[in-house]
């Protein structure tokens, strides 16, 4: 892993000596967005989207069901280590091509002239749909958490508490998205402030919860339980320990997504060819550390796994909510402290969704700038504050529409949000695959590069994505029925067929890949 010094001529070429601005001109693009983000702000957007409080909290049930403490404790590092290989490879490419288009632009440049249009088309659509799915799942998760907070605040499941209907939950989701679109319509200086505040909230929130919850709990699990207990009682008909461990990894892998935000924010980041890669790598690394601490802290307050997963408990089967609630109720006779803890998580999830919309809109802006989206001329326009305002509201609207299937079936909704993990990682892997194959000999690294390790790290990243794509498509319950079928391969396969057919029937005749907009 090395850092190359940028040529002086490049560093001085426009943009007040900013190397990212100079590199953007070399790539053929005008500076249309306000370049005002520091390396800290760039990191903050990715760290806030990864948001360990969001991913671990919302999928803690999955971790408990499939393997329990042992899977979560050690599986977190398995997923984290391989995620870092993906992040390192992406950071190396980002350093060479610091544009808002990110992944799809990289695929075009790395696959060669013959394959560039098709490669960027496939990568771009998997990336943007995956991002929309992330925003959908994050904000819907917040709506569901609000539902649980209201339930516990009004007496709990066993005390006559109010359980909001699915229509109320979707209304919460719509209101959250509306507020996120409004915030993302503000100038980038405001978003920079919110992003840094969100990162600080996530960091402090983890430390508060990992210390407070097990400290308050009157009964705590032993270290042996936290590090070695392997739960096989999943009520899913699955008995293979390896299979159970694999399914338990979903919590970790779902959490460790969204760090492509640092790449999509590069046209607004100072010296992006250096600071973009730093944002990606540091967001993953710090998330791995604080996420493990959060898992340990909460799991030390776990005693009775079947009860936590039981829909008849006070939190309606929402495991972490029940852990928080019981910890305070057992000591103080009231669970209000646990509800406040859930409020800390809710704020973190809110900021996660906010940053997701920011990343979505920059991707939509870049993709439409290259003519890949319907009504492209509308979506890549920027307002007087140099914000892609139309792309912001488009992203919010699509994320709302993607949540509507939840009104008919949560199974259908889960199929759609599965794209958030697998679909997005496919988009991550494609430019890395082109980097280690078609572009292996002619790739020109930027200031950050992996040196001789680049190809090996890249292959490790590609193989990991291929592995999780297969593993997370396996059945999660036996016997398999229409209600228990894992619809991930259906959703991801359906997206691939839709993108491929649109290419064959139409786009191949007019889409030529990324186009420059620099006059002269």
Curated annotation (Swiss-Prot):
GO terms for cellular component: membrane. It is a multi-pass membrane protein. Keywords: Amino-acid transport, Membrane, Transmembrane, Transmembrane helix, Transport. Gene3D superfamilies: Amino acid/polyamine transporter I. One of its GO terms (biological process) is gamma-aminobutyric acid transport. GO terms for molecular function: gamma-aminobutyric acid transmembrane transporter activity; L-alanine transmembrane transporter activity; L-glutamate transmembrane transporter activity; L-lysine transmembrane transporter activity. It comes from the Eukaryota. It is found in: Membrane. The chain crosses the membrane at residues 39-59, 74-94, 118-138, 168-188, 193-213, 236-256, 278-298, 334-354, 387-407, 410-430, 454-474, 487-507. May be involved in the transport of amino acids. Belongs to the amino acid-polyamine-organocation (APC) superfamily. Amino acid/choline transporter (ACT) (TC 2.A.3.4) family. This is Amino-acid permease BAT1 homolog. It comes from Oryza sativa subsp. japonica. The gene is BAT1.
């Amino acid at each position: 892993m090395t850092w190359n010094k940028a040529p002086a001529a490049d560093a001085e070429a426009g943009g007040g000596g900013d190397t990212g601005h100079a590199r953007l001109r070399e790539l053929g693009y005008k500076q249309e967005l306000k370049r005002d983000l520091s390396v800290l702000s760039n990191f903050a957007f990715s760290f806030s989207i990864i948001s360990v409080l969001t991913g671990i909290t919302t999928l803690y049930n999955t971790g408990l069901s499939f393997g329990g403490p042992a899977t979560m404790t050690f599986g977190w590092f398995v997923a984290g280590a391989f995620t870092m290989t993906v992040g390192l490879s992406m950071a190396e490419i980002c350093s060479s091509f610091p544009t808002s288009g990110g992944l799809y632009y990289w695929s075009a440049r790395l696959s060669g002239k013959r394959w560039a249009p098709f490669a960027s088309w496939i990568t771009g659509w998997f990336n943007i749909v995956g991002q929309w799915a992330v925003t959908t799942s994050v904000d819907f998760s917040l709506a569901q958490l609000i539902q649980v907070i209201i339930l516990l605040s009004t007496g709990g499941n066993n005390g006559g508490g109010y359980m909001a209907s699915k229509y109320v939950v979707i209304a919460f989701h719509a209101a959250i998205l509306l507020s996120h679109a409004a915030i993302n319509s503000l100038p980038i200086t405001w978003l920079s402030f919110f992003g840094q505040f969100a990162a600080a909230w996530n960091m402090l929130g983890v430390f508060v919860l990992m210390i407070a919850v097990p400290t308050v709990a009157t009964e705590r699990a032993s270290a042996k339980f936290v590090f070695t207990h392997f739960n096989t009682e999943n009520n899913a008909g699955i008995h293979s320990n390896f299979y159970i461990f694999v399914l338990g990894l979903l919590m970790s892998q779902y959490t460790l997504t969204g760090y492509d935000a640092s790449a999509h924010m590069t046209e607004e980041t100072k010296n992006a060819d250096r600071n973009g890669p730093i944002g990606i790598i540091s967001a993953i690394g710090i998330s791995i550390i604080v996420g493990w601490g959060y898992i340990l802290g909460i799991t030390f307050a776990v005693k009775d796994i079947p009860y936590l997963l039981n829909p008849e408990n006070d939190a309606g089967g929402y495991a972490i909510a029940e852990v928080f609630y019981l910890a305070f109720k057992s000591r103080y006779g009231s669970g209000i402290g646990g509800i406040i803890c859930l409020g800390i998580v809710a704020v973190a999830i809110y900021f996660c969704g906010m940053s997701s919309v920011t990343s979505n809109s920059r991707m939509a802006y870049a993709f439409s700038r290259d003519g890949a989206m319907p009504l492209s001329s509308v979506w890549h326009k920027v307002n007087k504050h140099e914000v892609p305002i139309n792309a912001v509201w488009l992203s919010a609207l699509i994320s709302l529409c993607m949540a509507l299937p939840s009104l008919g079936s949560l199974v259908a909704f889960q199929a759609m949000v599965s794209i958030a993990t697998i679909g997005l990682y496919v988009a991550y892997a494609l430019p890395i695959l082109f980097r280690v194959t078609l572009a292996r000999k002619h790739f020109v690294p930027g200031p950050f590069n992996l040196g001789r390790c680049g190809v090996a790290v890249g292959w490790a990243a590609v193989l990991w994505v291929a592995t999780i794509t297969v593993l997370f498509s396996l059945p999660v319950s036996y016997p398999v029925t229409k209600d228990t079928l894992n619809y991930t391969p259906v959703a991801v396969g359906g997206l691939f067929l839709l993108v491929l057919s649109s290419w064959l029937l139409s786009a191949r005749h007019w889409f030529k890949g990324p186009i420059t907009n620099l006059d002269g």
